[in-house]
Amino acid sequence: HQLIELRNNITSWVEAGEYRRRDVPYKEILETLNTDAATMRVFMKSENGMDFRSWRNKLRLQEACQMLAGHPEMNAEQISEYIGYSDSSNFHTDFRKFTGMSASEWRRTRTKTGQSN
């Protein structure tokens, strides 16, 4: 029952775009999701195979990929700020690790092929 409630709370949290908020203390996120650190750790490992921070970054980077393809009027810095990065250099480093290329390279390849993911 507790894990079902947590799953529902996380789904609502994601749908509300809360993962984009930057500088929110982890303790506050746990309170919002009505859970504790131990339960969250077990849930994230079993459901997603990673810790909360890594999972949240993955959500942000997936959104960045969609935005790079779908919003040519926005540059990578604007997108990084929108998805919750306070430092664009961290975004660029994380994006390269996630996709294997820079944001501009990724955008170029998706623009040519018409793909968005």
Residue ranges and their predicted role:
Residues H1-T11, E15-R20, T111-N117:
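Inter-domain helical "communication" segments and dimerization helices
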Residues A37, R41-W55, Y85-S86, F95-S104:
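HTH DNA-binding helix-turn interface
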Residues Q2-I10, P25, N57-R60, P72:
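N-terminal positioning helix adjacent to the helix-turn-helix/winged-helix DNA-binding module
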Residues S46-I83, T109-N117:
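Terminal helix-turn-helix DNA-binding modules in bacterial transcription factors
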Residues L30, R41, S80-E81:
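The alpha-helix within a helix-turn-helix
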Residues H71-R107:
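Sequence-specific DNA-binding recognition helix
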Residues N9-V24, M44, N48, C65-M74, ...:
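Basic, amphipathic alpha-helical hairpins
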Residues E28-D36:
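Helix-turn-helix
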